[in-house]
Amino acid sequence: SYYFLMSWAMLYLALSYASEVRAAERRAARFAQAAQQAELRSLRYQVNPHFVFNTLNSLSTLVLRNRPEEAESMIMNLSTFYRTSLTGDPLDDVPLADEVQLQQLYLAIEAVRFPDRLKIEIDVPDAVMSCCVPGLILQPLVENAIKYGVARATRPVTIRITAREVDDVLNIVVSDDGDVIPSDQDKGSGIGLANVRDRLDARYGSAARIEWYVPFEGGFVV
């Protein structure tokens, strides 16, 4: 009958529309995932050019000061750093042990540059070494500590990397005990911290965050 055919036609149209909506939602989800992956890759590789620039400046200084052995050591550490950091997928997380090892390589490079000023303390228990974190997530924080804490100081400055697991949440702290920074030079407004914040947000959303403060006696804690 007419009404029977109309009912079937309406049902067919409704099912077709629902199918198209689901297909559109799946396409939107794929596009959103692709955009997030592209964003994560972009943020990951923002770190590297800045690091290369600083290292080449350091190498140039060593060569000009006729310190070839130290320059060779820095080149070897840089080579190891890049061979390790660039072999993995930027979207993959890495064990905290690997991330700490990368920062030890980076700090070894900077120790050649600041032999009398840079002191290093790493306090990361074995119990959290297997926890996974985004690759190179600590690099901007350690670079900031070098740039604002060590490079501007006239005395020894200690950079500390610590990690603890509290209530199933991994807390990582990078700090330095450098001098009090002028009020017009806010470490918390730099590209490095914004990079870490954006990467954490893109990777974990509200499940992760970054915080920082300036101790009264000076230095910086992230």
Predicted regions and their residues:
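Two-component histidine phosphotransfer core
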Residues: 1-216, 220-221
